[in-house]
Amino acid sequence: MIAVVHHPDYVAPGQPKSGYQWNKNGAIRDLLRDAGDSIEWFQPEMMPLRWLEAAHDPDYVAEVIEARVPRAKERRIGFPINAMVANRAQIVPGGTYLAARLALDRGFAANSAGGSHHALAHTGAGYCVFNDLAIAAIRLAEEGRRVLIVDCDVHQGDGTAALTAGHPAIATYSIHAEKNFPARKARSTLDVALPDGLGDDAYLAALGETLTPLLDAERPDLILYQAGVDPFAGDRLGRLNLSDDGLVRRERLVARLAIERGLPLASTVGGGYGDDVLAIARRHVAAILTLGAAFEGQALKQR
């Protein structure tokens, strides 16, 4: 069975004048339910304050929790922060952390939300409030794990790179469209900047050729995977040209590289944008099911 972490509060009401698809997580949940007995559901707890503040400035954390984020920061995030959004922002990092803990026991687990890689120390950005990847990685590192964050979203994981820079137990990898958001890039442990319009074969070659040596150099205990589907050719905010089959091949490649090294992997959904929310949700679900199928029956080394 595939371990999937989900919380009812992942599905928050839509915000006015926001380009973020608030019903995407509900569609992901419903499609995964259709998979029936192949899914085992887990519900996360809210991430404790100390870990939110381990990644983010305490003043910004308080602004979010108390739903008093300044308008300038809300504009940068892309939607207003009300009490329901603030609650969701605290639960999603708990989901990514729980997925990681489950992966350490089972080989693979997925958070049905998360991947908020643009959130920075003092502010959110790009539809990201708190950086669940950085928060979970810092907590796992404090527990003695070496973590590699692999970010395959079409946008660079700038917030994740900035929040974990210099941490001796955390490394970051980002493969993204060079000319896409954010305009000002951070420095990951390894950045792979791709030209516009790159298709399946060239993308997968670049991914395999760059991620393989990084895995061998960093020797992590766990991979946190940002499995954004916005490299898809028709994505509203993407600049790459991957097909649905190319995305599936991407998941198989990432899974194979992890399995060959005995590494557990926890995934988050990341980005995916367009008018057809159901089609986007299907891509996210295909990623989870593909990763889960790859890890099924694999005996990873004990950690």
Q: What are these language model-derived features?
A:
Residues 67-303:
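A general "terminal functional-core" signal
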Residues 9-15, 46-50, 71-85:
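Glycine-/proline-rich flexible loop or hinge segments
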Residues 44-51, 112-116:
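Short, glycine/charge-rich beta-strand/loop segments that flank catalytic centers
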Residues 47-69:
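Charged, often glycine-rich, active-site loop that binds/positions anionic groups
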Residues 1-47:
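N-terminal low-complexity, Ser/Thr- and acidic-residue-enriched intrinsically disordered segments
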Residues 8-10, 58, 115-116, 176:
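Short, flexible active-site-adjacent loop segments at beta-strand->alpha-helix junctions, enriched
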Residues 39-49, 266-275:
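Acidic carboxylate-rich catalytic motifs and surrounding loops in phosphoryl-/glycosyl-chemistry enzymes
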